């Protein structure tokens, strides 16, 4: 038997991430005709930079540990007296792309820095950090930026190869 993950078949859950001919992809939205139109050989592998559990299944423990390093939740300085804490559309516009992340790990799989430095926070965590540092409702912007700037494995360890941007199935462009 062959072990693999899949769930939605609509590229919204991110569970089916794998390497196809060396690049991370969501296989539920990857058509063989697009990759091998003339019947070329396909190589399907588990995602990179993550521990292989079995066959094409990888452990996401490291992935989520990287995400946790950026405190991935909104931390406002006060709670509104009534209703929701609403931000204007204009103030949230620059976050729309990062909010599309489905946490599939394709960017982490193909990150060239993570191949040589397991301490690097990784592109998914950096995209998640961007989502909260730029949210006008969040009060921890300076603290988040300090962690990203000062800690070993932070943002300055990125080599800007932009492989994460190239493989992101949702166009999040974590390092663009």
Per-range role (PLM):
Residues 11, 15-17, 27, 37, ...:
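Short active-site-adjacent helix-start/loop capping segments
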Residues 1-21:
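A basic, amphipathic helix-loop patch mediating RNA/tRNA/ribosome contacts
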Residues 16, 24, 174-176:
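Short phosphate-engaging motifs
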Residues 5, 29-33, 99:
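A generic local secondary-structure boundary/capping motif
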Residues 20-37, 42-44:
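Glycine-rich phosphate/adenylate-binding loop and adjacent beta-alpha elements
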Residues 1, 40-176:
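Ferredoxin-type iron-sulfur electron-transfer modules in oxidoreductases and energy-metabolism complexes
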């Amino acid at each position: 038997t062959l072990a693999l993950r899949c769930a939605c078949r609509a590229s919204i859950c991110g569970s089916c991430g794998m390497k196809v001919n060396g690049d991370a992809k969501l296989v539920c939205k990857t058509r063989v005709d697009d990759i091998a139109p003339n019947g070329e050989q396909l190589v399907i592998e588990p995602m990179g930079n993550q521990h292989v559990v079995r066959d094409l299944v990888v452990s996401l423990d490291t992935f989520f540990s990287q995400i946790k390093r950026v405190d991935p939740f909104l931390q406002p300085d006060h709670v509104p007296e009534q209703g929701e804490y609403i931000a204007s559309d204009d103030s949230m516009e620059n976050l729309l792309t990062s909010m599309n992340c489905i946490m599939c790990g394709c960017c982490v799989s193909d990150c060239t820095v993570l191949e040589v430095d397991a301490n690097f926070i990784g592109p998914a965590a950096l995209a998640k950090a961007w989502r909260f540092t730029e949210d006008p409702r969040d009060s921890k912007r300076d603290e988040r930026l300090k962690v990203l700037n000062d800690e070993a494995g932070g943002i300055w360890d990125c080599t800007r190869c932009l492989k994460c941007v190239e493989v992101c199935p949702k166009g999040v462009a974590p390092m663009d």
